[in-house]
Curated annotation (Swiss-Prot):
Compartment annotation: Secreted; Target cell membrane
Propeptide feature ranges: 23-46
Name this polypeptide is given: Phylloseptin-B1
Originating species: Phyllomedusa bicolor
Role this protein plays: Antimicrobial peptide with activity against only a few strains of Gram-positive bacteria (S.aureus and B.megaterium). Acts in a synergistic effect in combination with Plasticin-B1 at doses that are not active alone.
A Pfam family annotated for this UniProt entry: FSAP_sig_propep
Signal peptide: 1-22
Tissue expression as described in the entry: Expressed by the skin glands.
Length: 66
């Protein structure tokens, strides 16, 4: 009976350890995806902030040529 009890505890312990490792990997993956999404948004904001400068430059060039 003691052998069965020890074996059961060992199986439960190893199961909990593997579950913990899987949860940690899942959390890391979600963090990487979130960080990548934030990087994409910041790049988009930088590009959108350049549009007024580009438009004014094109307008000045058109005024100079025309």
């Amino acid at each position: 009976m003691a052998f069965l009890k020890k074996s059961l505890f060992l199986v439960l312990f190893l199961g909990l350890v593997s579950l913990s490792i899987c949860e940690e990997e899942k959390r890391e993956t979600e963090e990487k995806e979130y960080d990548q999404g934030e990087d994409d948004k910041s790049e988009e904001k930088r590009f959108l902030s350049l549009i007024p400068h580009i438009v004014s430059g094109v307008a000045a060039l058109a005024k100079h040529l025309g």
